[in-house]
Amino acid sequence: YRRQRQMCIRDRMGTMSVEVPEIDQLLAMTSPARYGDELPDEGGRGGALHLSSVLPAISSAIGHPIPTAIHADPKRLQEALGLPDARSAVVVLVDGLGYWNINMRLGHSPYLRSLMADGVNQRPIATCMPSTTVAAMSTFGTGTCPGLTGMTGYTQLNPDNGEICQLISFKNAPAPLKLQQQPTIFERLACLLYTSPSP
């Protein structure tokens, strides 16, 4: 079955060389990915190939590099992710759609298939731990990590009263601006653009 999947991917992609792991390997617990600006060692995860590096890398690509508490070199992230310089950028994010999900269904998306033919796109980026939407979206938006954003899951301890709070409706939760104090990359870009002298 595995050989059949590999051949199917190669047939659809032509030069595609990504080998989809067996399901038990995909579901196995792994150590958390590290943060930073360097490419991970062979077989390693994270560093420049992390969800938190995407927006700092894009900020560099559009000419306004925004470093964060865990990513000091947005230009290095841009190079690691293979992003060209651009005047503007559009980010399309689909919650829950991972690298292996895409690879196993490339026949359904000709555009994604064309992107995956580029070697720089033939490697996954890591997400944060825990990988819930609350933690991951704040990690993505700020270019930092759940420990800095204070957004660690759907339910967590409210530090103000010691009760469990819910972070979808913010029931029993601190005020959102009090809980999540890291500025987003978008907020920081807006500050740059509004304080820059106009031409």
Regions found by a protein language model. Give the residues of each.
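Single conserved hydrophobic/aromatic residue that forms the stacking wall/gate
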Residues: Y1-D11, Y194-P199
